[in-house]
């Protein structure tokens, strides 16, 4: 009897342990599987509206943005839900609809991809227009070159052929080329013309310096201290990057000074 009671007690404890172990495991597994497998299905009325639209537009089942908004209002769904439904419907429902009509589904998918090509061409055309923007941005620099040519022409007249060659140099170079290396991107014919433009200011400056030497020799040794500034050798031809306005001011001041010195020499005589 004792052994039977002990066996009964042990068996009862084992069943209790099994119940306590099984219950939480079953609940957790069922709860976890319920959370994982649960899917929110759309309302039947909304799905029917979307199916009707898909069947009417089965040969081109790609709604526009306005049509998506209209369908979202009719079905009381968000536009994201409408887009996702059409993405899945084109893969699952649309091929069967087309096969019932005796059509090949692959033909309509290919035709849709073909219609997307104009969008790529639009992108290429927009990129092409961007490539022309630097040429339009170079136009503000043309007045600066015009003023530079005016200063060169004011110091000494230049032939009209060399003056007209200056805009061609700007057209064949970029803004960075004018700042860094203006001669590397120019045409071979234009390089010689640019050197012709550089030569007249140097000649004009040497002519003015010679006149200053003659005035200084006429005035005598007393004026050597004042004319010492003009005994320097002629400078090298300036680059295109230099500003000629400073040279123009120096020439004007020097001419005025020379005129004053000539008046003083005449008065002393």
From Swiss-Prot:
Localization, UniProt: Nucleus
Classification via SUPFAM superfamilies: Homeodomain-like (SSF46689)
Keyword DNA-binding assigned: yes
Key word Cytoplasm present: no
InterPro entries the record matches: HD, Homeodomain-like_sf, KN_HD, TALE_homeobox
Broad class of where this protein is predominantly found: nucleus
Pfam families noted in UniProt: Homeobox_KN (PF05920)
Annotated keywords: DNA-binding, Homeobox, Nucleus, Repressor, Transcription, Transcription regulation
Annotated DNA-binding residue span(s): 35-97
Cellular component, GO, one term: nucleus
GO BP, sorted A to Z: negative regulation of DNA-templated transcription; negative regulation of transcription by RNA polymerase II
Role according to the record: Binds to the F' element of the APOVLDLII gene and represses its transcription.
Protein name as annotated: Homeobox protein AKR
Species assigned in the record: Gallus gallus
């Amino acid at each position: 009897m004792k052994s039977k009671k002990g066996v009964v007690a042990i068996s009862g404890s084992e069943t209790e342990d099994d119940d306590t172990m099984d219950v939480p495991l079953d609940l957790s597994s069922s709860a976890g599987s319920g959370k994982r497998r649960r899917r929110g299905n759309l309302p039947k009325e909304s799905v029917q509206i979307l199916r009707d639209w898909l069947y009417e537009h089965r040969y081109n089942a790609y709604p526009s943005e306005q049509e998506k908004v209209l369908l979202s209002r009719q079905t009381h769904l968000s536009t994201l839900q409408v887009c996702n439904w059409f993405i899945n419907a084109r893969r699952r429902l649309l091929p069967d609809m087309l096969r019932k009509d005796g059509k090949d589904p692959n033909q309509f998918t290919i035709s849709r991809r073909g219609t997307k090509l104009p969008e790529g061409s639009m992108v290429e055309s927009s990129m092409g227009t961007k490539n022309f923007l630097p040429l339009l941005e170079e136009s503000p620099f043309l007045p600066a070159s015009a003023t530079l040519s005016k200063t060169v022409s004011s110091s000494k007249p230049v032939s009209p052929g060399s003056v007209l060659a200056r805009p061609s140099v700007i057209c064949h170079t970029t803004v960075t080329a004018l700042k860094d290396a203006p001669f590397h991107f120019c045409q071979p014919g234009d390089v010689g013309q640019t050197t012709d433009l550089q030569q007249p200011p140097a000649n004009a400056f040497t002519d003015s310096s010679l006149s200053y030497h003659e005035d200084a020799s006429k005035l005598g040794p007393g004026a050597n201290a004042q004319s010492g500034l003009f005994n320097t050798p002629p400078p090298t031809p300036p680059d295109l990057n230099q500003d000629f306005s400073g040279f123009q001011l120096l020439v004007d001041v020097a001419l005025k000074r020379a005129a004053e010195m000539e008046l003083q020499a005449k008065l002393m005589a």
